[in-house]
UniProtKB/Swiss-Prot annotation:
Domain of life: Eukaryota
GO molecular function: serine-type endopeptidase inhibitor activity
Protein known as: Subtilisin inhibitor
Record-annotated site: Reactive bond: A38, D39
Keywords: Protease inhibitor, Serine protease inhibitor
SUPFAM superfamilies in UniProt: CI-2 family of serine protease inhibitors
One Pfam family matching this protein: potato_inhibit
Function: Inhibits subtilisin and more weakly elastase.
InterPro entries, per the entry: Prot_inh_pot1, Prot_inh_pot1_sf
PROSITE patterns the record matches: POTATO_INHIBITOR
Keyword match Glycosyltransferase: no
């Protein structure tokens, strides 16, 4: 699996359930308009959140 589109609209804390499917995941919560590095990491999942800490786009691996 490479993304979790069903997490859009849920809180970042609730979205951390990704760990149930991917225990090795390194979860990063970042504001939706933040600049992030372009490097690719197989274990990293970024949760892009709005000001109310809700996920605003599908959480991709990378």
């Amino acid at each position: 699996r490479t993304s979790w589109p069903e997490l859009v609209g849920v809180s970042a804390e609730e979205a951390r359930k990704i760990k149930e499917e991917m225990p090795e995941a390194e979860i990063q919560v970042v504001p939706q308009d933040s600049f992030v590095t372009a490097d690719y990491k197989f274990q990293r999942v970024r949760l892009y959140v709005d000001e109310s800490n809700k996920v605003v786009r599908a959480a991709p691996i990378g």
